[in-house]
Every structure is written in structure tokens, then in C-alpha cells.
Amino acid sequence: MADTKVEIDLDYKGLEQCLEEIGRDFQGEGYGLDRLLERYRSFRKPGMGPAEGMEALIRSAAELTSKETPLWEFAAARLRYCGFACEVEEQLKGLGIKGLYEKISYLTEQGLYGDYILKHYSREEIEEAEGFLDDERNKLFTYAGLDLLLKRYVIQDHSHHPLETPQEMYLGISLHLAMKESKDCRMQWVRRFYDMLSRMQVTMATPTLSNARKPYHQLSSCFIDTVPDSLEGIYRSVDNFAQVSKFGGGMGLYFGKVRATGSRIRGFEGAAGGVIRWIKLVNDTAVAVDQLGMRQGAAAVYLDAWHKDLPEFLQLRTNNGDDRMKAHDIFPAVCFPDLFWKMAEENLDQDWHLMCPHEIRTVKGYCLEDCYGELWEERYLDCVGDDRISKRTVMLKDVVRLIIKSAVETGTPFIFNRDTVNRANPNSHRGIIYCSNLCTEI
């Protein structure tokens, strides 16, 4: 241990104790401070500053992680937290902040914390909550988990300097979640929420981890929108998605009502560009609205299995073909009726007819996507037999082949069995369920 202290000469408060604990807690073949020191020597360079040296030490521990010695990932996390804690302490010292109440007051003044926390809780209650904090629970983090949490979820000032520890983050979330409980038991709920989160008995979705306790406290993850077949409606849906993504939500967008490529616009034949061009707009919005750089937006786009643009839709994320018809950052999903699978089971060489929803609405006076089950099947076959409606006829096996090819290359499309979902819908009196969201991947 003496040699280690000399060779790892980094001016970080608590580092010596951290190394001693690593040496004590991680023993056995493949562990030990001598191994860490040996790897650190290979990374150390003359003239390294303290920050670079600490990063090299963390990297040394992280790269020792293997199938045979998995616990090095926890050792790396301890070193990562040691460096982070020093950075936070330095920031707070410069601001003259002592204690959790002063910290929350400062963060509220800076617009980094929601003022509702101080409105709901007294100083005494926040000081009581501060007593719940248990830094020993930081030892439960793996390096990858802690590194992600420190980069994305703890509160930073406007210059990206951290001002909150992971345990304070969990406590802040707990204060938010419990604030509407009755006063006589509210602090018990704060303690209960904090214990469950900090012991990693439960976890929260990204919007809750990121937004609870902050001014824009949007906690929901999943949203759904039906994209109308109009210019105004399409852009309104894209704007809705941008607003949802801005605060951490993901969205499922149903494009089954949008007219297909070559369809009429104001009576002019062949004017419509189809759904792919609009989906590219959603794709670019997901990339652009990246939640203050925290993470890229997420959208699943849904199209019916009978839509004329299905073949191009199934190739949205594949690596071959015209890149102008690609959308690599969204998650395509297909809404399948039972009829498709029944026909595929009977004979894959059968024809499957693709049609434009706008054309069906114009000719037949109803929206095929607005029904399911036997009524949908009856109307679909009626449309197939109507010569006034143009069809794009493909073989079932070609559709299945495109699905398999895309699934192998990209893991998509997600499969949404619309008849099964709508039969199970307890609120069918409120209308049809057109699609789901990103959760369809489960």
C-alpha cells in the first residue's frame, strides 16, 4: 500500500481512503491494488495534471473489468465518484453553500430547481430529509451506470459544473414525488421513496430522473399522436413531438392516415410525396431536439400493413438503397391485421393488396383504419374488389422477406397486432387504438 500511495500521487480528497477500501473490499485472484497500479503505470505520462491522472486511474480500473474479474467495475465507480465529489465540493465552497437547504435555495434562485419544493417543504423538513442521505449507497453503482448518471441526470450549473450528488438527486426526486402527501406522513414517504431509489430496488424513467425537482417537471415517458392527412396537421404533429421530446418524452406517431406516394392533392394526380418524406422530418426533429444535449429524441412511427408505401417503409433503416428515403434515427413499426397472418399461414404465395387511405376515403366514404376485426376484413375485401381504387399488389412472401431482412439488419420494424389490441381495449367506446409507442419493442 505504501508504494501505491507514492506512485498514485494525486491531490484528491478522500482518494487515499478510497484506495484503501478498494484494496480491502476487492480481494482474490485478479484483484488487488498491485494490479491497479500496474495498469495505471501504462496510462501515466510525464506532465499529467491531476484531472488527467485521475481519469487514467479510473480508466485503469475500468479496463481491468472482465468476465473473470467483474468487480473492477464497482472499483472504477468508486474512483469516479471520488473525483466527482471533489469537483462538487470545490463548486460549493466557491459559492459558500453549506447544507442541503442552502443548496436548494441557491438552485431555485438560479432556475435549476423548481420553487414548488420550497413552497411545499419547510426548512426543518428539508433538514430532516438531509439526514436520510447515505453516501455508502454510492458503492452500489457500476462504473457505466454512475458515469451515465453523472453526465446526464445530476443538476449542473449553466456552465456545466455539477452541483448535486447522486444521493441528493434521489432525495430531490423523492421530495417531488411525496410533496402532495398529507403533512402527517409526508416525510415518511420521502424516506421510503429515497430508500427504494438509492438502494436500487426501483428505478425511474428518464423524464422522472431528469425532471423531477426541476422547474419543468414533466415526468411522463410515453406519448401517442395520430398524424392527420393535411399539411397543417402534419406540421402540428411534428411540433407536438418536438415539445414532448424537449422534456424527455418519447412518442409513437401513427402515419396510417397520410396519403400514399402518387396520390391526388386537390385533384391533381401523382402530386403526393408519400409518408417517407414526412417521416424524415420526424427523424430530423428527434436528432435536433436533443433535450439540452442530454440524449437524442425518440420516436416510433407506425404504418398499416395495407398502406401503399409499406415496401419503402420497411426499408427505412436498412443500409442499402436511396439514402434520401432513409430515416436511421426513428423506430418503424407496422400495424398488422389478423387477416395478414392468417393468409401468410395458409399460403405465402398469395397476393396482398396495398392501397392509399386517402383514396379509400374519397371513393368509399369511410376510413379503413377506423375499424378492426370482422368489419375491417369485410371492408378491406370490399376495397380490393372495387376497381375504382388503385392497388399495389405484392406477394405475401415478399412482404415477410422485407420484414425479416429489416429485422436482421436493424431490429425493426416493431410488430403491432391491431385486432388483438382493439379486442382487448376496455375503452372501445372512445374509439380505435391506431398504434402504440416505443414500448412495442418489448
Label each PLM-derived region with a short phrase.
Residues 1-442:
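Extended catalytic cores of very large enzyme megasubunits
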